[in-house]
Structures are given as structure tokens and as C-alpha cells.
Amino acid sequence: MTDLHRLSIRELAKGLSQAKFSSRELTEHYLKRIAKIDPQVKSYVTVTPEQALCEADAADAALKAGNATALTGIPLAHKDIFCTKGIKTTAGSKMLDNFISPYDATVVEKTKAAGLVTLGKVNMDEFAMGSTSESSYVGATSNPWALDHVPGGSSGGSAAAVAADLAPFATGTDTGGSIRQPASFCGLTGLKPTYGRVSRFGIIAYASSLDQAGPMARSAEDCAYLMNVIAGHDAKDSTSVKKEVDDYVANLNNTSVKGLRIGIPKQYFNVAGLDAEVKARVEESLKKLEEMGAKLVEIDLNMTEAYVPTYYLIAPAEASSNLSRYDGVRYGYRCENPADLMDLYKRSRSEGFGPEVQRRILIGTYALSAGYYDAYYVKAQKVRRLIQQDFLKAFENVDVIAAPAAPTTAYKIGASLDPVEMYLGDIYTIAVNLAGLPAINAPVGFDKDNLPVGLQLIGNYWSESQLLSIVHQYQQNTDWHTKRAAIAEENA
């Protein structure tokens, strides 16, 4: 079959269980597509054909023996921030260019246990710091919808791989929008779960109180299948929460859009820099939900102006602490011929980290320094609590909150925006991480240049099933999620 890449996860699972095709055939199909198409997209940093085919053969044996799970034999790609035993894990950095993890991240462990086949590792912004995937040490990834545009970040490789049909779904991480924004830029569905819903064990840390892993796929249904695998408590992650996990696939039709109260924050739709076409597409999608029976309720989120300064004190502060472990001594990049120990530290870090990572380490170190700790970091944590309370107050009157996932569509590679401009572009996504809430992006149309636009829905704690269900029903009534970039239509 030449069009296996056009099948949904449900259709792939059905085809495998009915022996219409084997996992080996499916895996070979994707490997051929990667070999032909990815040199243009540059989504993968490491492709693992031998391991993938070995896992596919094991999946076929399990399917034949009747020992298969719902997803046995289906391929996926992992963001290169998840530790993978025996496979290089770089986090997009020269610092970890030759790092091979001795263990699997819990998310990877769970996908293997479910019989999923790892195609390889996909590109990302260095240490997940960025919104374009341009800061990666191996080079920029292209947006399949326009190869001279960025796919977003930091999970840009995950988004590009799925959008180009080089993987049926992929794992991502979201510290301030890194699943939702690239999903928006590439016309995909992407879910950032509640903090603590998915294990962080084995994820190379950026900001520990903000990082969360989640699925990226074409549809809410496809995301639900992957959430069923990766969600759940993990004793190896102290921030993982002991809470019963929903059957996200079974719950896809459990939330009625009829009567659903969708909060429309006044402040969000009056942000300077919100593109008129993005605003129009988002408003059209909300009108569609209203036609389906939802009720649009105008709300206030009065802390909106505090999002960016608060996030860009807390996240860099945590990053400066987490990244202090990379000193050239135990693992990671080591400079050549250091004069002494201090020279080893200084040069290894200066040469191993890229400019954006260095910038955030400097900001974070400054915020944590003795003279400024109370004035900046402690104050930011207090404001963080106010942002959380702002959301909780809103949820007393609405079920979900709607917003754009990004103020613009994808911009051109090398546009070299001012860092502050880039930070301001995160305004719609970062508060969700500060509050620890779940949120989802759904594709809702295109701008005049045929670049995708995304709608973000923010839910209350542990409402992943509700968010997936709302988007699933929206996708039953629209076809934006089925649209494919021209490059994805190519056959290997």
C-alpha cells in the first residue's frame, strides 16, 4: 500500500490487527518516506532503521500470537529530549552531542511496553529554549507547509515530522507552549497535559516546575491513543501525581459541546501583535462551536500583562540551576586543553551552550543572585500564584477558556526577531504552564499564505478528557485536521 501514511491511528491499529499489512511493512513505509522527504524538512536528528525493524518484527510476532496491545506495531517519533537507551540524546545541544543515555525515559519505556515502534529522534530548540527550532545545534527544521518557514518550537521536529507524514504521531514536551505553538504552526493537534499527569523522568530538564510531556498528532483521537499509553503515576518522578488515568479514547464523545461554556478573555483578543487573520480564524472556529451548541462567555483575565515577565524570570532561574550540571567533568561537551579547572568550566560551558541558552542562564542566574532574589524570583513566584488564582476564578463561571495558540502564523527561517519579541510571542501559552493547567491546540484554518492557524482551549486541572472530547467533536464537524501540506502528499 502506498498510502499507509494517510491512515489514522485507529485505522492503522485495525489494519494491523486484521493483518491487512504488517508492522514491518508499515515501518518500512515510513522509513522510505523519511529517506526521501526528510532531507527537505530536516525533522529527524537520528533515524534508527535497524532498531525500528527489529521492534516491528517483535510487534508482528506479538500480533500473530495474540499478545498485542491496542497500538502494537504502530511507529512514532520521540523528541530528542527524551532519554533513549542506546540511542543518542542531544537535546539539540553541542553540550550533549555525543551523549548516549544508559536508560529510557518513562515515556519511552511506556511506548515500548505498548508495542510502539521507535523510528528515531526528532529535532528541537536547544534544551527546549525557543519558539522556532532554529537554536538546535544540528540546524533548523523546516515547516512542511512552507519550507522557508519555521515549524515552531521547541517541539518543532515533532510537529514537522507528523505534518510531513514522516511519523503518525510523536512525543513532545511543553514548558511554555512547546507542544501547542508548533502544533498551531504545522496544522496539528497537540495536548499539554496537567502538570504531573505524565512522568518527567528521563526528560532532560529545562524548568522543572513547568516541563510536561504530551502527544502531537493530526487529530484529537490520535492524541488520545498516545495519552492512553504515556499518562499515569511514576514513582521515579517526585512531581508525578497519583490520580486515576482516564481512558481518553473511550471518553472522546463524553463531553457534550451543547451547553458548554467557553470563556473568551477580553485581554487575549486585544493583545498588541495579534495578527488580524489569526484572530479571524479563531473567531470563526468559536462561531462554529457556538453553532454546535456551545455558549461563549466574555471573561476577564486581569493578570495577562504579568505573564511574560513572570515566566521569563521563573523559567530561566530554573534553567540556570538545572543546566549547572553541565560542566565538562562527568558527561557532555568538554573543551580541549583546559589550563585549569576554572578554565575547563568556563570554556566547556561557553563553547557547549548556544547563545539563547546562555542568555537564559544569565537571566536566571541574575534573578537568583543574593542581591536580587527577593526582588525578582520571590516576587515572580508570588505573581505566579495570582495568575493561577485568576484562572481558577474564571473556571467558576466557564468550562474551558479559548485563545489563539500564537499571535501569528509561522515566520520565515532566519527572520531573526529580537529575543524580547520572541518572548512576547509566547503570551498565549506560558500562563498555562505557570498555573500547571492542561491545554490543547486544534487546527482551525489558514492565513492568506496558506499557513495554519490554531485555536487553543485551556481546561481546569485534570480535564484532558474534556479537552480531547471537545476538539474531537469539532473535528467531526470540520476538516481542517485532514488538510495536508503538498510535501506530505509525496509518495516514497
Curated annotation (Swiss-Prot):
GO biological process, one term: translation
Entry keyword annotation includes Protein biosynthesis: yes
Record keywords, A-Z: ATP-binding, Ligase, Nucleotide-binding, Protein biosynthesis
One Gene Ontology MF term: ATP binding
SUPFAM superfamilies, A to Z: Amidase signature (AS) enzymes (SSF75304)
E.C. numbers: 6.3.5.7
Pfam families: Amidase
InterPro entries, A to Z: Amidase, Amidase_CS, Amidase_dom, AS_sf, GatA
Keyword NAD in record: no
CC annotations in GO: glutamyl-tRNA(Gln) amidotransferase complex
Job of this protein: Allows the formation of correctly charged Gln-tRNA(Gln) through the transamidation of misacylated Glu-tRNA(Gln) in organisms which lack glutaminyl-tRNA synthetase. The reaction takes place in the presence of glutamine and ATP through an activated gamma-phospho-Glu-tRNA(Gln).
Complex and partners: Heterotrimer of A, B and C subunits.
The family this protein is said to belong to: Belongs to the amidase family. GatA subfamily.
PANTHER family reported for this sequence: GLUTAMYL-TRNA(GLN) AMIDOTRANSFERASE SUBUNIT A, TRANSAMIDASE
UniProt name for this protein: Glutamyl-tRNA(Gln) amidotransferase subunit A
